[in-house]
Amino acid sequence: MSIDFQQLPHAGIRSLIPYVPGKSIEELAKEKGITDIIKLASNENPLGCSPLALSAIQTMSSHYIATYPSPWNHPLMSKLASYLKVKPEQLFLSNGSDYLFNILLNCFALHTDRHILTHDYAFSTYAIQANSLQIPINSVPIGHNWEVNITDIVNACNQQTGIIFIANPNNPTGMLIQQEEIKYLLEQIPKSTLLVLDEAYYEFAASQLTVNSLDWLEEHPNLVVTRTFSKIYGMAGLRLGYAIANPSIINILKRVQLPFIVNQVALAAAYAAIDDDDFIQSSLKMNNEGMSQLQAGFNELNIKYLHSSCNFLTFDCEEDSIALYNYLLDNGIIVRPLHAYKMNNFIRVTIGTKEQNSRFLTALKNFYL
């Protein structure tokens, strides 16, 4: 008897549209037979990783690699806590931010009568993970200016709202919600509702913020802030994210975590990277200059784009973006079309080096002119 394994999972899995990452350089090289490729699709740091992190990796002993990691006893815990001005018991280390979202859903929404709340054009993994667990998710529409109306979030929240997911700044729009609005949201929602503030791009937006969200943790124990070493630190390949929250929340997460969720290499690299302020400042300088370079290029071509507080720009092709996307691929440039977000006319491009940005803008001009 033939078994249709597609029908064995629950309905949430069967109907799931999986997250598809940006095309890799290796994938495009295989498809097109070209070697001169730049990737501006996944908001990675074009400068690579911190030299201090790389040195820490290169000098690791084989014994360190051969032993199981112990994240909670690693010196990174106290060092990161000191850097963030929080207590070690407020930290939870994770194999990337995605695992954080999954474990939060499992702990605070799964097998309850509670739902998840976010907004349209939020980071897609929130809905993907909620749907995979068959947790109802409600999405609040945003305005024509692509900005989130916090009052609408407040009005949509009730006692059955288990978790609110907000990325600030948001991917893929790049929009930043001012801290006064986030504080207002915290003051209005039920104390039993977690606000998960996804700050993956925090370092790129920090200069625009008047308050650090971590300052609210004591007053609002239902706040969970997530950050990552993937973006500004250039460590996306090592998968290290972390949550900062009330110790009681952290304790619950530790009860259900998978064993050895953070590897030894990531721990050593992050421990070193925290000290590399020169690399952080160089990355921010390059990003600011690259942002201005791309904006000037878009303005010259009369291309509309969304204001961004991240390390990428999302722009409007004014028609389905697939033609431009394929043209850029043919020219060895990988960007990110946003059909998965139902933004069919939009493309997201990572801010690259000056040379990478110039190559992208030249290809853009050749396509449109």
From Swiss-Prot:
Q: Which cofactor does it need?
A: pyridoxal 5'-phosphate
The Gene Ontology biological process annotation of the record reads: L-histidine biosynthetic process
Record has Amino-acid biosynthesis as a keyword: yes
Q: Which residues carry this modification: N6-(pyridoxal phosphate)lysine?
A: 231
- List the protein's name: Histidinol-phosphate aminotransferase 2
Its lineage reads: Bacteria, Pseudomonadati, Pseudomonadota, Gammaproteobacteria, Legionellales
Assembly behavior: Homodimer.
A Gene Ontology molecular function term of the record: histidinol-phosphate transaminase activity
Superkingdom as given in the UniProt entry: Bacteria
Q: Please name the CDD domains in this protein's record.
A: AAT_like (cd00609)
Enzyme nomenclature, EC number: 2.6.1.9
What does the record give as its pathway? Amino-acid biosynthesis; L-histidine biosynthesis; L-histidine from 5-phospho-alpha-D-ribose 1-diphosphate: step 7/9
List the keywords (alphabetical).
Amino-acid biosynthesis, Aminotransferase, Histidine biosynthesis, Pyridoxal phosphate, Transferase
Family, as annotated:
Belongs to the class-II pyridoxal-phosphate-dependent aminotransferase family. Histidinol-phosphate aminotransferase subfamily.
Enzyme class name: transferase
